[in-house]
Amino acid sequence: MANQEQIIEAIKEMSVLELNDLVKAIEEEFGVTAAAPVAAAGAAAGGDAEAEKTDFDVELTSAGSSKIKVVKAVKEATGLGLKDAKELVDGAPKVIKEALPKEEAEKLKEALEEVGATVELK
């Protein structure tokens, strides 16, 4: 069995897509979720949770008809390689970027929608 240092080193060398797949596999294997417990507590606090939200996740829900343009836009926005960006777009719905300020998230959403993608802010 690998020790903690070996596991951490293996994780350091994984791509974003590989890490995403790893998280999903861990969630399924152990019946847990990687969702932040703070978000659940904030939602229970009352109706002001939406007004206070400052960080947004940009989720690609569909690539639309011009998938090549969307792959290029995702590659540019995330800094991923072409193969990883294509896998991310092919696997939609997927979160492209997490915890962005509202203005930056809206700019990314607009840029992706301009090339034909369907995008949601969460």
Swiss-Prot record:
Disulfide bridge map: none
Keyword Translocase assigned: no
Keywords: Ribonucleoprotein, Ribosomal protein
Gene3D superfamilies: 3.30.1390.10, Single helix bin (1.20.5.710)
Any one of the GO BP annotations: translation
Ribonucleoprotein listed as a keyword: yes
Segments crossing the lipid bilayer: none
GO cellular component terms, semicolon-separated: cytosolic large ribosomal subunit
GO MF annotations, alphabetized: mRNA binding; structural constituent of ribosome
Pfam families, A to Z: Ribosomal_L12, Ribosomal_L12_N
Function as written in the Swiss-Prot or TrEMBL entry: Forms part of the ribosomal stalk which helps the ribosome interact with GTP-bound translation factors. Is thus essential for accurate translation.
Subunit structure: Homodimer. Part of the ribosomal stalk of the 50S ribosomal subunit. Forms a multimeric L10(L12)X complex, where L10 forms an elongated spine to which 2 to 4 L12 dimers bind in a sequential fashion. Binds GTP-bound translation factors.
Similarity annotation: Belongs to the bacterial ribosomal protein bL12 family.
Protein's name according to its UniProt entry: Large ribosomal subunit protein bL12
